[in-house]
Every structure is written in C-alpha cells, then in structure tokens.
C-alpha cells in the first residue's frame, strides 16, 4: 500500500484486523472522482479480504463515488413506503452501473406492528423489491446504547447483535438460515406496490 493510505488507516482497538479509512472532514465529496475511488479500492484489494464502503444518503456524487469500485451492494432499507421507493430507485441505478450482485437488509423492523398490519412485513418488502434477502435487523434500543457508548453491537446478546453477526456470516458465504418471521400483507404493502409499479 502507498504510505499515504497506511497513514490514513485507523486500526480498531478491539479487532486488530479491522481498519477504518475515514473521509476528509475539510473537503466535500466532489474532491474525489469515481475514477480515483476505483483506483483506491484496487490498491486496497490485495491487503484486505473485505472492503465495506458506506454510501452516503441521496443519489449524488457521493453515491457514484461509493459504487465506483464495488462488485457487490447491500441495500439497507426500513419498512416504510418512502424508504422502499428509495431502495427501488437505488437498485435500478446499481443495475445500470453493472452491479448485479445486490442483497437486501431490512432494518428496524417491529414484529408487533407487522402482526397488527401496521407495518410492511419482510415478505411484503422482498416481493416489492425482488432482491435476495441477506438479513433482518429488529428494532432494538441496544443499537442506540452501543452507538452512544462507542461500542460494537457484536458481543451484545441482543436480537440486533445476533442479526448483525448472521449477516456477516452470510456475507462470508456461510449458510445461515433466516428465521421465520410473521407474514401478513399490510395496507402499506398495497400502497408501496402501487407507487413503485404504477
């Protein structure tokens, strides 16, 4: 690796094989081009088994920079109509950029609301987006607690912590079955399906 990349990498105190490459706080996203981002990822590939790129919200320069060097995408959405529409749009842009290996993560789902029909079910979301599901993260206050304490959620014996661990195992190629979740077609499914497929 070039010396400037080595100097920019921050090693995690708890996980010696985990590094973070933060973006510059003094520059905006237009300071880096998609071509430069692609070159950076190529330089990192030989030294790392997995490179996760956190994509900014919105579909602007930051989005195209983030996907420039990607060979796989994990779309994280929540069970809300507006979020599902955004995820559908992102899927189309990824496919247009020739990223075909796209998986879905559903975040902050509340099974009590799904049972009452007040929230789209996992089945609803997968039906609308037609993506392979790689994980479901239940709404869990421990996520907020861990984030505020600067701690990793893995190692917490919580539903969300277990969900993150299972997603990681699936990314690494393990066959980890998805749990059985409540299924119920909600009013929101019909609304989202109409808005996306009209």
State each model region's role:
Residues 22, 79, 138, 152-153, ...:
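Proline-rich low-complexity regions
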Residues 3, 31-34, 84, 119, ...:
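Electropositive phosphate-/nucleotide-binding environments in soluble metabolic enzymes
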Residues 150-198:
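NTP-binding/hydrolysis catalytic cores, primarily Walker-type P-loop NTPases
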Residues 4, 8, 36, 121-124, ...:
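Exposed alpha-helical structural elements
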Residues 1-46, 147-149, 154:
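P-loop/Walker-type NTP enzyme "switch/lid" segment
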Residues 35, 39, 43-46, 50-145:
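Conserved catalytic-core segment of NTP-binding enzymes
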Residues 10, 14, 50, 130-131, ...:
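Generic secondary-structure signature for well-ordered alpha-helical cores
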């Amino acid at each position: 690796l070039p010396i400037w990349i080595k100097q920019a990498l921050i090693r995690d105190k708890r996980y010696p094989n985990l590094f973070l490459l933060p973006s510059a706080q003094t520059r905006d996203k237009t300071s880096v081009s998609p071509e430069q981002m692609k070159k950076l990822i190529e330089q990192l590939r030989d030294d790392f088994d997995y490179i996760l790129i956190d994509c900014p919200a919105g579909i602007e320069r930051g989005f195209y920079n983030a996907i420039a060097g990607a060979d796989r995408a994990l779309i994280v959405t929540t069970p809300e109509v507006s979020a599902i529409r955004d995820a559908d749009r992102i899927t189309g842009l990824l496919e247009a950029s020739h990223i075909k290996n796209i998986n879905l993560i559903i975040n902050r789902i509340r099974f009590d609301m799904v049972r009452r029909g007040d929230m789209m079910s996992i089945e609803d979301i997968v039906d609308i987006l037609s993506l392979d599901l790689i994980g479901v993260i239940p709404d869990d206050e421990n996520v907020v607690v861990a984030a505020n304490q600067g701690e990793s959620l893995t190692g917490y014996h919580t539903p969300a912590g277990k969900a993150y661990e299972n997603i990681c195992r699936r990314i690494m190629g393990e066959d980890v079955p998805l749990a059985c979740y409540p299924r119920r077609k909600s009013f929101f499914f019909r609304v989202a399906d109409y808005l996306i497929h009209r």
